[in-house]
Regions:
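N-terminal strand-loop-strand
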Residues: 1-31, 79
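Residues that scaffold the ATP/ADP-binding catalytic core of kinase and kinase-like folds
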Residues: 23, 39, 126
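Alpha-helix-centered segments that form part of catalytic cores
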Residues: 105-121
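Charged phosphate-binding loop/patch that engages nucleotide di/tri-phosphates or the phosphate backbone
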Residues: 116, 120-147
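Active-site-adjacent beta-strand/loop module that shapes the phosphate/pyrophosphate-binding cleft
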Residues: 67-104, 116, 138-142
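The catalytic Nudix box helix
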Residues: 31-65, 79, 119
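Short, charged/polar surface micro-motifs in flexible loops or helix N-caps
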Residues: 6-7, 18-21, 37-38, 56, ...
Length: 147
């Protein structure tokens, strides 16, 4: 999700929940996203994941930005929607993890523990390195529609 504020582009990012991510900030934030099941429409999955991780519904006007290949070889389909929401109001789904690792102890954590709007420069510092190309796709799209 993106919005324009004072003629600047801002992107909505989420911070993963749980003890592993608790003290990590720069390079730890993410675009709300997730896996889709076999047979599930990727755009439907994107909408579902956004709602699960934030508690917010998105608009209908999603724009396909393309596909990026992450370091591990995974192909990620990227869409964007213009919108607005209050990060203080997020309500994330919960997930179960083993913590500490290999301990056999299961704990329930929020998939996302906070969210925020960031201008593109700051978003580049905060976002997971593997997701930075998604910001490039957004910027290229916005430049294209502005001309």
């Amino acid at each position: 999700m993106y919005r324009l504020r004072e003629l600047k582009v801002e992107v909505f990012l989420v911070h993963p929940g749980g003890p592993f991510w608790a003290k990590k900030d720069l390079g730890a934030w993410s675009i709300p996203k997730g896996e889709y099941a076999s047979g599930e429409d990727p755009l439907d999955a994107a909408r579902r994941e956004f709602a699960e991780e934030t508690g917010f519904e998105t608009g209908e006007d999603f724009i396909p930005l393309g596909t990026i290949k992450q370091a591990g070889g995974k192909l990620v389909s990227v869409w964007v929607v213009e919108g607005d929401c209050d990060p203080a109001q997020i309500r994330s789904n919960l997930c179960t993890i083993e913590w500490p690792p290999r301990s056999g102890i299961k704990i329930e954590i929020p998939e996302v523990d906070r969210a925020a709007w960031f201008k593109l420069d700051e978003a580049r510092e905060r976002i997971l390195k593997s997701q930075a190309p998604m910001l490039d796709l957004l910027l290229a799209h916005l430049k294209e529609v502005a001309t």
